[in-house]
Amino acid sequence: MTQIITGTKTEFSIDPVILALLPEQGCVELQRDAAGKVHQFHTHPVDEILVIIRGALRFEWDGGERICRPGDTILLPAGTRHQSEALDEAIYAIAMLPPAIESASN
């Protein structure tokens, strides 16, 4: 059953970095990984932007590897093969940037 609960949160702010990631229409995901969590090599059909908020990630892609820390931004073009490992608890924002959707009236 759908419920709407009002008045539970009266103050809410969005970090300007997160707000800047939001496309005109879309979403930003907050991901939290426990230390040692590995996301095995994979790809995405759309561009992806990750912003490290807390902790550290070992980020690998074909041809490179880097330890990423708070404030680092990772730009992944669609189809980039990559994996990550949380070196300690890590929190990061992910924006998937799909191609523009054409209007049904076109």
Where are these regions (language model features)?
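A short, N-terminal "cap"/entry segment at the start of jelly-roll beta-barrel domains
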Residues: M1-Q31, Q40
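Short histidine-centered beta-strand/loop micro-motifs
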Residues: L19-A20, V38-H44, E85-A86, S105
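Short, conserved beta-strand element in jelly-roll/cupin
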Residues: D33, T43-F59
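Structural motif
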Residues: I49, A56-R58, E65, R81, ...
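Beta-strand residues in well-ordered beta-sheet regions across diverse protein folds
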Residues: I52-I53, E60, E85, I94
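Short acidic-glycine-tyrosine-enriched beta hairpin
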Residues: G63-A78
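Ligand-binding loop in jelly-roll beta-barrel domains
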Residues: A78-S103
